[in-house]
């Protein structure tokens, strides 16, 4: 019996790529899903300048680069850059030969069919993987929480999904997708900071604002009340030091930015807030499963990491639900990585081993096999 080869699990988010080995309890590599290209031509010979940089290296040289995210709203829009990110993941981050390991990738719910096929094709033809599988992100988050039934609110950098799952099956007719997530909140924070006189405009400066957002923002339990408190005292104000040493103060922006999750109208979007989207999704499900969904609302993704978000969600959903309904919000501390963790669990199950698409099956059937084997 030869030694089991660990599968590689890669969760390609719009903002961050999480990668590692099946069976581990956390991803080994977490880096920004960015490809950067120099804005200026190099004038110094022998500096070893590259024509593109990926991930943290792109981030650290962002002052001289134009940064591009190949995944927008959870869906790959630039395959050349995506290939660079996968190449970087295998060879630089995990330091593995992809032709020796099965590869599990994740995808957004309601991902276009052509995208799944392209993904499959690249993994087999460019990277020569021996086996491949693609799994829906929200379903993996639910696995990670140890459930098979629940409704997952998965909000990352590029897209927010609400996915009801019953006994391990996503209910496709009730899935909702909102193209509003972390990146939009960052942009909104840039906008409201500009009103205060702090101007951030380049792609590099946007990353500073993202850091401010991650460190200082929170969700208010009662927005109107919080606005009033903020206007009357300065106890909600916090300071932040910019890379050049300048210190800026932010006040009500701390909770005004994430409030867009509950009131997308401030971003000029017509969709309802995440609470309304979740409620509508539950209402699209069969009346018999609703109780189980209300009792298992699972949050996942980086944009659910704001302090106060679970309490606010509890309050909003309780107000919408029938009065006798027991509403429970589950917000596991590791939810930033729960999609990856779910993938790690799935790919190491003994029962899963017959689910992989093998290279041989791919060679016989072509990319469309992904629709038959992965659901």
Swiss-Prot record:
InterPro entries: Actin (IPR004000), Actin/actin-like_CS (IPR020902), Actin_CS (IPR004001), ATPase_NBD (IPR043129)
GO CC annotations, alphabetized: cytoplasm; cytoskeleton
Keywords for this protein: ATP-binding, Cytoplasm, Cytoskeleton, Hydrolase, Nucleotide-binding
Family note: Belongs to the actin family.
Record-linked CDD domains: ASKHA_NBD_actin
EC number of the protein: 3.6.4.-
Domain of life: Eukaryota
Pfam families xrefs: Actin
Functional note: Actins are highly conserved proteins that are involved in various types of cell motility and are ubiquitously expressed in all eukaryotic cells.
Entry annotated with the keyword Hydrolase: yes
GO molecular function, one term: ATP binding
Originating organism: Exophiala dermatitidis
Name of this chain's protein: Actin
Compartmental location: Cytoplasm, Cytoskeleton
Reaction it catalyzes: ATP + H2O = ADP + phosphate + H(+)
Group of enzyme by EC: hydrolase
Disulphide-bonded residues: none
């Amino acid at each position: 019996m030869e030694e089991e080869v660990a599968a590689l699990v890669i969760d390609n988010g719009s903002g961050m790529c999480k990668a590692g080995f099946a069976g581990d309890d956390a991803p080994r590599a977490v880096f920004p899903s960015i490809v950067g290209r120099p804005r200026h031509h190099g004038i110094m010979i022998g500096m070893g300048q590259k024509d593109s940089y990926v991930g943290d290296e792109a981030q650290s040289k962002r002052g001289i680069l134009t940064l591009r995210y190949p995944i927008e709203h959870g869906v790959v829009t630039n395959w050349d850059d995506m290939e660079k990110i996968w190449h970087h993941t295998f060879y630089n981050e995990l330091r593995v030969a992809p032709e020796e390991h099965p590869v599990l990738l994740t995808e957004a719910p309601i991902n276009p069919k052509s995208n799944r096929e392209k993904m499959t094709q690249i993994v087999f033809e460019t990277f020569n993987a021996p086996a491949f599988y693609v799994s829906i992100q929200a379903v993996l988050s639910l696995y990670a929480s140890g459930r098979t039934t629940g409704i997952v609110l998965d909000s990352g950098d590029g897209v927010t999904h609400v996915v009801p799952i019953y006994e391990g099956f996503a209910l496709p007719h009730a899935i909702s997708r909102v193209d509003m997530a972390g990146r939009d909140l960052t942009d909104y924070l840039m906008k409201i900071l500009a009103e205060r006189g702090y101007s951030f405009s380049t792609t590099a400066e946007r990353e500073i604002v993202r850091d401010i957002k991650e460190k200082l923002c929170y969700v208010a339990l009662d927005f109107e009340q919080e606005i009033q408190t903020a206007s009357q005292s300065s106890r909600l104000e916090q300071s932040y030091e910019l890379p050049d040493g300048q210190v800026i103060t932010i006040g009500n922006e701390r909770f005004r930015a994430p409030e867009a999750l509950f009131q997308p109208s401030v971003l000029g979007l017509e969709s309802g807030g995440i609470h309304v989207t979740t409620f509508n999704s539950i209402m699209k499900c069969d009346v018999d499963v609703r109780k189980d969904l209300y009792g298992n609302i699972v949050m996942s993704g980086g944009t659910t990491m704001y302090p106060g978000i679970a309490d606010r969600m509890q309050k909003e959903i309780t107000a919408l639900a029938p009065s006798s309904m027991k509403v429970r919000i589950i917000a596991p501390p590791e939810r930033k990585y729960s999609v990856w963790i779910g993938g790690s669990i799935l790919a190491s199950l003994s029962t899963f081993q017959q689910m992989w698409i093998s290279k041989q099956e791919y060679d016989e059937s072509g990319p469309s096999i992904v629709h038959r084997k992965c659901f």
